[in-house]
Amino acid sequence: MRNLVVGVVVGLVIGVVLGSAIVAPRLKLPAHKTFSQEQDTNITKPASRFVSAPRSKRKPAPVHWRMASAYASQMPQMGEQAQRLDNSIWHLSDGVFRLKMYEPGTLVPSNQMVDAVRSQAIDAAFAAPSFWAHKNPAFHLFSAIPFGPSAQEYLSWIFDGGGREIMDELYNHQGLHGLVCGIIASEGSGWFRDPIESLEAFKALRIGMGGLGGLVVQQVGAKTMNLNEGDVFVALKKVMIDGAEASQPAVDMDLGLHEIARHYYFPGWHQPATLLHLIVNGDAWLNLPKSRRAQIDAACASNVAYGLAVGEARQFNALREFTKHGVRIHTWSPDILLPLEKAWTKIRVELGKGNQDFKRVWDSLTKFREEYAIWREISAGTPMQN
């Protein structure tokens, strides 16, 4: 029996050897596949060690638009926001769209920007809407309003209180599309050579101030000169004016106004907040891809947030620096401030009578402010008056 078992085992071994060494090669098949060999039959091996990535679509040729700015690129805040808009859109579009900023007067004079955009002589402009309020006084109310809303309240009305809808209508009538694309919060009221002790002393002054604030100053009896921020220093130095407003303390520091006038007045009643707009030709805007319009919207929203945050953060250091140079910081006497506010009321009533758009904008803003005041008092913990 033992010999029989040994014989069977030897026979099986010889059979396996013969099958593997002789039969299988003739059939050109492996006698047995390992697990790894089984897997290899289902894998297509690359021809080389490196597999090239699929070729991406070619980036479209960059589109370049020309944007006239009312503010020099080196000017803090206003010029800074214009340059920032240029950079932001370039990066958001991945280098496909460029809204190139041009310095004031390079493309067209600043007071001709709106006509140049409308005729497509240039592609866009960046400025406060007061620069084109000669087309419609209602644009003043989307720029800066004497004794008007704070920056927060202003933006709330624009974006969620009915302001934007009216603004869009006004721009459409001009063949334009406009976006709120920057902001300056509360400013200083002005720089003066001497302290101003009375309304009579104020009336005798020559003041560099434009916009609605300039109309108010004229109404109380003072003389005004409409100046760009960059021209204020020269006008003060040459004694062409007795005082002037420019912007926020950090901007005024850069302009060097403290070197000439030592009396700095607050509050900035004429411009509690100033909106900066980007305007483009209406047809050109509609012809942009939706993605491009969304990028411009996003860049403008970012600019507004930046302008508000930075504009508030920088002012204390500027004021501290002014005091080191002997500047005296004043607040207006009620004997001067109240007559200015009454003068503004008279002016805005007259403007409303002569322009239905102005009245419609003012009524919308007034209604919003009345309702907003209730929330502001409650949220601030201020006792409400019955």
Predicted segments, located by residue:
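N-terminal secretory/targeting leader peptides
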Residues: 2-154, 166, 171-386
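Short beta-strand-centered segments that line the small-molecule binding cleft or hinge
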Residues: 157
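Core domains of carbohydrate- and sulfate-ester-processing enzymes
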Residues: 161-162
